[in-house]
Amino acid sequence: MSCYRKRHFLLWLLRAVCMLHLTARGAYATVGLQGVPTWIYLGLKSPFIEFGNQVEQLANSSIPLNMTKDEQANMHQEGLRKLGTFIKPVDLRDSETGFVKADLTKRLVFDRPNNITSRPIHPIQEEMDQKQIILLDEDTDENGLPASLTDEDRKFIVPMALKNISPDPRWAATTPSPSALQPNAKAISTIVPSPLAQVEGDPTSNIDDLKKHILFLHNMTKTNSNFESKFVKFPSLQKDKAKTSGAGGSPPNPKRPQRPIHQYSAPIAPPTPKVPAPDGGGVGGAAYNPGEQPIGGYYQNEELANNQSLLKPTDTDSHPAAGGSSHGQKNPSEPQVILLNETLSTETSIEADRSPSINQPKAGSPARTTKRPPCLRNPESPKCIRQRRREEQQRQRERDEWFRGQSQYMQPRFEPIIQTINNTKRFAVSIEIPDSFKVSSEGSDGELLSRVERSQPSISSSSSSSSSSSRKIMPDYIKVSMENNTSVTDYFKHDVVMTSADVASDREFLIKNMEEHGGAGSANSHHNDTTPTADAYSETIDLNPNNCYSAIGLSNSQKKQCVKHTSVMPAISRGARAAIQECQFQFKNRRWNCSTTNDETVFGPMTSLAAPEMAFIHALAAATVTSFIARACRDGQLASCSCSRGSRPKQLHDDWKWGGCGDNLEFAYKFATDFIDSREKETNRETRGVKRKREEINKNRMHSDDTNAFNIGIKRNKNVDAKNDTSLVVRNVRKSTEAENSHILNENFDQHLLELEQRITKEILTSKIDEEEMIKLQEKIKQEIVNTKFFKGEQQPRKKKRKNQRAAADAPAYPRNGIKESYKDGGILPRSTATVKARSLMNLHNNEAGRRAVIKKARITCKCHGVSGSCSLITCWQQLSSIREIGDYLREKYEGATKVKINKRGRLQIKDLQFKVPTAHDLIYLDESPDWCRNSYALHWPGTHGRVCHKNSSGLESCAILCCGRGYNTKNIIVNERCNCKFHWCCQVKCEVCTKVLEEHTCK
């Protein structure tokens, strides 16, 4: 009989232990205190991108203007028209004229009438309307002028007719008149533009106004010395110089040679020295007369003025030119200005390059005093021919390089871009052009071969055969190009269709249309682009949609969005990684240093807490993801978005242009909201769904019925013999159960459960009880288990409100079982006021606060465009701030976070009414932070033991704060390093070995 009782007792004990295990897990399954999986795990290990060792940060090479050179030229002409016909004196101390002050920030206040009630607007538009405008100038000095300009540049103000922004090679070289070769004739050179140039307006139409204006400027320089310092002198227009211009007097050399006017513009190719044609066949058909003064305001340096001047007076008669157009005879004493217009092209004539000759001086003219260059004395020498070929090849390479830089801005007119451009091994883009849109090349085989030859990198040790072949190919190409007479702008008259991603690997994509016209070179030439471009992903990415189902930490709705928008996942992964790195930077000197684990919770069991630290993490992760998506849109890495299309801010000046290529905050804000908040909003989640809640309610009802039945049995057996140690057993069981409650969230839950079983068995076996008392004891144990786990926390009386709310906020929270337990024992407490709905509302609020932080720290950036630093045109766009700036802003919000609770209506409200209501930019939390000073097994937190601190610091990294008053250990570290290094001739560096003793302080 005793064996039967003992067997029955063991079976009952086993059933009680199993029931304890199941009820404990069921009670805390909805709370999720074992750690909540999060999508931030993509920052540790992502199937979409292979992370490197670098720190994630936004690309700072912003693109202020996403447009071609032609569009910039049109904008420049528009700005010149706004300046007026005559240039007025400029006061450098007046900012209204366009010069930038030292204070680059212009604050424009927009006052809205109070009586107007407007409907709610988008948060991005609301923030942009309140932004301060920052006017940028890359290199400015204390006066606000570009620091790269010299003194002569700062006082050089070019008249209207001289402002040619891009000399076009379509203007043909001047044709010499037949009568120019006749001696003893006086004429003025006739300039005949090419037929292509006649389509556009001739910039010499306002020549009379230009002359009057230049004379007006020189009269002003004589009366006002201050005014003279701001302008360039024109010696050829002075009256006394005009009278002696034909006497052979040499012009006085200025203190500093002025820059050519075309250098203030943006030419396609840099100007090269011109070689004069034989017998007056040079520019303007005039022969060179040494000793005479050049006419006009176009100045070269000393070498060009003595040897290769383009602007020369002539004494020959004027006759009709080849084109049939002629100019009337003019008085040689009248001041003349030869403009730098399109007829004076920067491109040299091929015939003049291949067969140059020397201008023979006339009879009676003074002999040349200086020795001419070798190429003028013997232009047919092999050395001079090679030099001319090298110059032509250099100009062609610069033109090709410029077109390659503009190839990425070629947008299709009829087809959208289906896929993005990613320079990776697994994902790349190829460009396909339909046959109906391809343009047949009219060039010969020599032209194609020359382009292939130019695209090869130049190697100093190249063979003689390759160099000779290039010499053979080059003249043919020059001949063909001159016969075809193709213009520079022909490259922009063709469309490019970007259709799909294909097989390009480890190289930049090439636009076929540009390649057919010689506009594209080698694949490695993108490093020399003049326009700043955003680099593609340097890491290897994999955009397979099947990776979304294997990604760890994503919810069901997030996986669905991942499949639909797989191309955005690398940006989200980089944003999650940047959030982890920024969190560790911001908290590196605090007690909790944002340590991570290798599981899907990223931060361990503390993710189940609604503490301020988790509020900061949620806000920072939402902010970084929004920033990286917005920057990826701007850089062209996503096919679903491009540059920002945001509306124009209200405080922006009317004359300023709103455009450029800004960060697409609108798309990033919407996508980040849908992706991140979907975990909190979905209704069929594992721990927060309606179905799970109903099962919990039904389970509570069943246990409530069982408890009522047990209470009836307890009332009948209220008096138990104290000699049998029944009360001692119940007390020990209660203590064991409460200890299990405090450690229920430990990862070693099974081990604690086994210890509890051993304690119960030991207490029962050591006590002397009979069969009837054992039955009563079973009922009491069962009652204690059920009441402790389920109903004691719900039946806890409501606490009275303390007068000191600060003390109440600093006091440790109470668990559901009503037992005061601090965090110092390693146990983790269940949330008292935070329910599942409150935690979801808290996460939604903090996510929105992170996105608002990105909008808050974004700025409106403007840049001046114009000649010599003048703001003839101002372009503005919106630009993101750095991740570090956003992290600093959110850390300040973390320090001022507000504690909230959920009310009866299911909404969050502040717990202490003395504090102000948090806005959408503030952080909120539900639970107080644990004690980070001591180790916690439940939180997987080792405490601050062994942390390095600073002894003499007064901040958070000081030993007094970081060590929590426990003191610190001091350790001396001896370091041997090289010092006092010196270089000895020859080729030796000798250093001494210095010994340093460093002190390291660690917390006890």
UniProtKB/Swiss-Prot annotation:
Q: How is it modified after translation?
A: Glycosylated, glycosylation is stimulated by porcupine at the ER.
Q: Spell out the Low complexity composition-biased ranges.
A: 458-470
* The keyword Nuclease is assigned to this record: no
Q: Which segment of the chain is annotated as a signal peptide?
A: 1-29
Expressed, tissue-wise, as follows: Dynamic expression pattern during embryogenesis. Expression is seen in the limb primordia of the head and thoracic segments, mesodermal and neurogenic regions.
Instruction: Give the family, as the similarity comment puts it.
Output: Belongs to the Wnt family.
Q: What is this protein called?
A: Protein Wnt-5
Task: Tell me which species this is from.
Answer: Drosophila melanogaster (Fruit fly)
